[in-house]
């Protein structure tokens, strides 16, 4: 078996194992951590199959590379979404350029946290160790441009978002969250009455 070399262990941690090429079958296989069983990639979870290509190609991602990443949060549970945001920031800090689309308020908030921590850590460096975040997992907001795509009945509006006190605020995501919270509260009130 030939194992790809790795830079960061972030993806390896997310998949909780290793992906390697079986030299006999010429197919990639997944080996769960602390297990000798090799699983054909198509038989693994969507989290593993979705991250496989990036995991395999990670060693070839160089400074100046341009990566397009559609919904990096797709098929990832919330903890893995947070790890993915950190991994993306480390790639950007290594000089990669990225174009990312997302529908996830959780993913956007994790990116916001990593951007805001860049400012906060300048006057409170201990906060990084307190939150278990590495220096290469935060970055300045001036490396980022965020656009909010909002669809109404006849057209799509595209608005560049400003980085404010609490990061980038995407109204299109917040409106849906507010409606869900209002609906949930109304249902809970009805149950309690």
Over which residues does each language-model region extend?
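Phosphate-coordinating catalytic segments in nucleotide- and nucleic-acid-processing enzymes
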Residues: 1-66, 94, 135-193
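Conserved H-loop
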Residues: 97-106, 111
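Conserved hydrophobic alpha-helix in the ABC-type ATPase nucleotide-binding domain
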Residues: 83-85
């Amino acid at each position: 078996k030939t194992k790809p070399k790795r830079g960061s262990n972030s993806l390896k941690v997310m998949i909780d194992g290793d992906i390697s090429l079986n030299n006999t079958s010429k197919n990639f296989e997944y080996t769960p951590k602390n297990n000798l069983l090799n699983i054909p990639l198509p038989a693994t979870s969507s989290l593993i199959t979705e991250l496989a290509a990036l995991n395999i190609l990670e060693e070839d991602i160089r400074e100046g590379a341009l990566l397009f990443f559609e919904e990096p949060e797709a098929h990832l549970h919330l903890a893995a979404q947070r790890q993915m945001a950190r991994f993306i920031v480390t790639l950007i800090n290594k000089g990669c350029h990225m174009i990312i689309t997302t529908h996830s308020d959780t993913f956007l908030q994790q990116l916001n946290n990593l951007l805001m921590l860049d400012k906060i850590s300048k006057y409170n460096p201990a906060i990084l160790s307190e939150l278990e975040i590495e220096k290469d997992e935060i970055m300045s907001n001036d490396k980022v441009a965020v656009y909010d795509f909002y669809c109404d009945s006849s057209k799509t509006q595209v608005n560049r978002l400003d980085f404010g006190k609490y990061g980038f605020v995407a109204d299109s995501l917040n409106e849906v969250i507010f409606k869900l919270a209002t609906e949930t509260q109304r249902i809970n009130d009805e149950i309690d009455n």
